[in-house]
């Protein structure tokens, strides 16, 4: 088999390079919200913090987690209680599921020639979320920062993955949407990198990914 491929989760396996916060804001606006991006972002970051502290978070699947985060976020926004929470969650989750269904054959194809892994800054329930999307069985290694106790771009978290695969950094690829956590972090330890981002998104200063794609469906050609 050829070298392992590591993937980020949010924004990578469930969307074409668009982070959760940005997609949450779009869903909020579609459900009737009117707060400016800066006000929403402050509330979203606080809801992230509260979600991570919630008892029982490790057992939540994707739908339950998203619904809970929206419950936490609504009172933090100026008009949050007036927003249709069900429509907000349904739109967000529906788009994720469509992307996951599209990406599943790509991942299954890669498993024929490479071991795959996920390395994500998450909340302790990465496995249930991957399972709900039907993606868990594609991965040999699943590293959740809340479980491991390390967060990207910490080199030690990447090293946990390399050790699990019994491969060197130079033999591995990292695919992700975050310039700092995924691409710069992996490159710093010697891993090849593939940045997943919309075509219109400018390359951040100083970022030098080995490859760039706009959809995970483009990845097999990059790796060949």
Language-model regions, residue ranges each:
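N-terminal helical cap/lid subdomain that shapes the substrate entry/recognition surface
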Residues: 2-105, 127
